[in-house]
Amino acid sequence: MNRSYSLKRHKEFRYTYARGRSQSASLFTLVYARSRNESVRVGFSVSKRVGNAVQRNRVKRRMRAALTPMIGEISGGWNVIFIARPEVLDAPFAEIGKQMESLLRRAGLWRDEA
């Protein structure tokens, strides 16, 4: 995933959590809020409940890899945060991508539905 799509600053995460809406599934919670940018900005949050540092970083890498091919399908002008749940550790890669797409569609952030 290109760096320009990344949500990095604590201030951006706080803004998205405070003003955002959410959708939930078994592997993730999606929090999304309108942003001033024209492009979509995506962040990933994996708490210590998910596992040790190695497991958390692996989950973030898998989430980024699953989202990369779909980044062009997400409507611009949004801050999006995917919050991982512990179940994501045992989930197959295909299921991760499927649930991410499903959450984005339910939130109305998928291009053909926005």
Question: Model-derived features: where do they sit?
Answer:
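Positively charged, solvent-exposed patches that mediate nucleic-acid binding
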Residues: 1-114
